[in-house]
A protein has these predicted regions:
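Glycine-rich phosphate/diphosphate-binding loop of Rossmann-like nucleotide-binding domains
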Residues: 190-294
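Flexible, glycine/charged-enriched surface loops at secondary-structure junctions
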Residues: 33-39, 107, 144-153, 175-179, ...
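Adenosine-phosphate binding glycine-rich loop
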Residues: 7-14, 209-210, 313-424
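Glycine/serine-rich phosphate-binding loop and adjoining beta1-alpha1 elements at the start
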Residues: 84, 103-218
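Glycine-rich, N-terminal phosphate-binding loop and its surrounding beta-alpha-beta segment
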Residues: 49-121
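Rossmann-like adenosine-cofactor binding region
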Residues: 253-343
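Short, Gly/Pro- and small/polar-rich lid/capping loops
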Residues: 7-50
Length: 424
């Protein structure tokens, strides 16, 4: 009998609670491997660190940091690092678990990990940001490495943060270790195509889902929540395919134009000031009205838990593409399924980022780098192969794409765990 974890008390709609619910749903499809399922309901390792730095005004500030390695049965841990004032251990645990599922779903030789610091980076100077990054890297350095756990960018982190992390780790081990992180600048071993990879993956899976639904992308109405690298890139690619982006929401507010927003003008403004600064391009509406906008495709590409049961009842979308991690709570998932709304789940839909991170890692070890066309061809092939296998599983068992994705991924993870056995 396995005891429940003592250090978290998840609710049904909390990130960890959502993840546990998703795992429970696939147990009937695991056969004899189900005896190992408890392995997926607890992290392998959870590290909490104190991150003290001297601020520009001379005061000493302390920040709380985390690195969680959920499961590494199939390979090194892989997952991003986020800087956000609301980061919690439970959230990082869930994100690391979703990385375990995600890497297995697209059949990459990784496990799942995630990290974060409870900090608002917008309130830090560049010097303070570098200090907190380097101190955090030093604190988690005991468990990360090119063959053990490879961080990457996530919310409020970028290539510069990864460069500082790589340099700090390298200084501590006495040699340049470019493979310790991915999402690096190109001249430090980064990969072409990495910045747009997650958004491209959303487009590739969404295009195939629309085809299977008989939905013509030409003229299709799309609403996008979150307009960073994921949301904006996906929006651009869908617009190029003939779709209309009728609503966009970011941290500043919501803009709507039923005739389609002009992305060529919106994106530069949004990157600098947020979407509400583009007042001439559409109507600024209350944030909750975003969920009432008439659309064919909904792309949640912000944070977790955005599609609640109430919002699932509101949306007119026939297709939901989860660009964010964990954007749909379990009750909302059930409502969408009952309403006949197809959901392409996060653990396959937004796997483009980790796939190109894998390409970067491989290129770093070989010191041989591919051009962007080759990156995109390989990315599209991996995403389509994974989606087709998941779709076949869903059709075979008459289950949702999310449950099918978890069934495929969990079988791979637990088979690896069973074949490796327990030591000692």
């Amino acid at each position: 009998m396995s005891e429940k974890l003592s250090f978290v008390s998840p609710t049904a709609n909390s990130p960890w609670g959502t993840y546990l619910s998703q795992v429970d749903r696939v147990v009937p499809y695991l056969g004899p491997l189900a005896r190992w399922v408890e392995t997926l309901k607890r992290p392998k390792r959870a590290l909490i660190v104190d991150v003290p730095i001297e601020m520009d005004d001379g005061t000493i500030a302390h920040f709380e940091g985390y690195r969680v390695q959920h499961n590494m049965s199939r390979g090194p841990g892989k997952g991003g690092v986020r800087f956000h004032p609301d980061v919690t251990l439970e959230e990082v645990m869930a994100l690391s678990a979703w990385m375990t599922i995600k890497t297995a779903a697209v059949n990459l030789p990784y496990g799942g990990a995630k990290g974060g610091i409870r900090v608002d980076p917008k309130k830090l100077s560049l010097q303070e940001l570098e200090k907190i990054t380097r101190r955090y890297t030093s604190e988690i350095g005991i468990i990360i490495g090119p063959h053990t756990d490879i961080p990457a960018p996530d919310v409020n982190t970028n290539g510069q943060i990864m460069a500082w992390m790589m340099d700090t780790y390298s200084m501590n081990v006495g040699g340049t270790a470019t493979g310790v992180v991915t999402g690096k600048p190109l001249h430090l071993g980064g990969s072409l195509g990495r910045v747009k990879a997650t958004g491209r993956g959303v487009f590739v899976t969404g295009r195939e889902a629309a085809r299977r639904l008989g939905m013509d992308l030409r003229g299709a109405r799309i609403a996008v929540q979150g307009f960073g690298n994921v949301g904006s890139v996906a929006a651009e690619l869908f617009a190029e395919a003939g779709a209309k982006i009728v609503a966009v929401q970011d941290h500043t507010g919501t803009i709507v134009n039923t005739n389609g927003l002009d992305l060529a003008q919106l994106i530069p403004v949004a990157n600098k000031e947020g979407v509400v600064a583009f007042k001439s391009g559409g109507d600024i509406v209350p944030n909750e009205d975003f969920w009432n906008v008439a659309c064919d495709i909904l792309i949640p590409a912000a944070l977790e838990g955005q599609i609640t049961a109430e919002r699932a009842q509101k949306t007119t979308a026939k297709l939901v593409l989860e660009g964010a991690n964990g954007p749909t709570v379990p009750q909302a998932d059930d409502i969408l399924a009952e309403r006949g709304v197809l959901v392409v789940p996060d653990v396959i839909c937004n796997a483009g980022g980790v796939t190109v991170s894998y390409f970067e890692w491989v290129q770093d070890f070989s010191s041989f780098f591919w051009d962007e066309d080759e990156i995109n061809v390989r990315l599209d092939r991996i995403m389509m192969n994974a989606l087709n296998q998941i779709w076949d599983t869903a059709d075979k068992h008459k289950i949702t794409l999310r449950t099918a994705t978890y069934a495929v991924a969990c079988e791979r993870i637990l088979m690896a765990r069973q074949e490796r056995g327990l030591y000692p």
